Amino acid sequence: MRYALAACLLLLAASSFVDAKKKKIADDELGELLDNIDADEEKKSVEPAKNPCEDHQCGWGKECVVGKKGEPTCECISKCPELDGDPMDKVCANNNQTFTSLCDLYRERCLCKRKSKECSKAFNAKVHLEYLGECKKLDECTEEHMAQFPERMADWLFQVMKELKKRRELHKLEWEELLSEAENDDEKKHVYPVIWKFCELDTKPHDKSVSHHELIPITAPVIPMESCIKPFLEGCDANNDGNISIKEWGKCLGLKEGEIQERC
């Protein structure tokens, strides 16, 4: 059963979450959307545009509004885009509350943080994405499943790398070369994919560590099918400093000391 789930995870992770048939959110898109949740604005190094908001990016759940003096400001988005009712648009928050979309979740968060009258529940000021899809009762993460998780995840990542290479979406020639090595070496096929995924997650910011926030793009799509992934990955933070180093990541996923290498 669990290996069948691993196959499902591969299909989920290796394909886009938004396509013509199933409107899901891709890992990279999800990471981009969550990158500036609480940011007010970000200036781009381009020439000033006529519209002050053109050069400013607001956090998710917010929109740029031109102030009375012509200055761009970020306000809670007035209305989220209307959707067609696809259940895959729904998201589950960390308080087990289902929202119509990511936009609605972070609009509510924004309104509540600013103590707006439109805020439905004050405690939603700290709400954030838990996983994609409507909230539901998740399977129990047993000790047995947790113990098996490192090997299953390493194998899953290897399959994901192979699929991305086939689709020419495995960025950087170095990873393609390492994958070719791994395909002919049983030991390396559980080493290189683990290091690759660490580098994929360590982007916002790229500081040679992975925060719990940076884990969201990998946990949010998978939690509904694999309840062990979040507690397992959070447990990789051995020193409880809020960040997972490459050594913590490698050790957590079963790599030996000499196999953990910095390649980001």
Swiss-Prot record:
Belongs to the SPARC family. Disulfide bonds join C53-C64, C58-C74, C76-C110, C80-C103, C92-C135, C141-C228, C236-C252. Has a high affinity for collagen. Affects nematode body morphology and mobility. Essential for C.elegans development and muscle function. The cysteine-rich region could have protease inhibitory activity or may provide the framework for a protein binding module. Probable role in skeletal morphogenesis. The lineage of its organism: Eukaryota, Metazoa, Ecdysozoa, Nematoda, Chromadorea. Glycans are attached at N96, N243. Residues 224-259 form the EF-hand domain. Keywords: Basement membrane, Calcium, Copper, Developmental protein, Disulfide bond, Extracellular matrix, Glycoprotein, Metal-binding, Secreted, Signal. GO terms for molecular function: calcium ion binding; collagen binding; extracellular matrix binding. CDD domains: EFh_SPARC_like, FSL_SPARC. InterPro entries: EF-hand-dom_pair, EF_Hand_1_Ca_BS, Fol_N, Follistatin/Osteonectin_EGF, Kazal_dom, Kazal_dom_sf, Osteonectin_CS, SPARC/Testican_Ca-bd-dom. Residues 68-137 form the Kazal-like domain. This is SPARC. Expressed by body wall and sex muscle cells. Probable association with basement membranes. Gene3D superfamilies: 3.30.60.30, EF-hand (1.10.238.10). Ca(2+) binds at D237, N239, D241, N243, E248. Residues 1-16 form the signal peptide. It is found in: Secreted, Extracellular space, Extracellular matrix, Basement membrane. Pfam families: FOLN, Kazal_2, SPARC_Ca_bdg. Residues 52-74 form the Follistatin-like domain. Its main location: secreted. One of its GO terms (cellular component) is basement membrane.
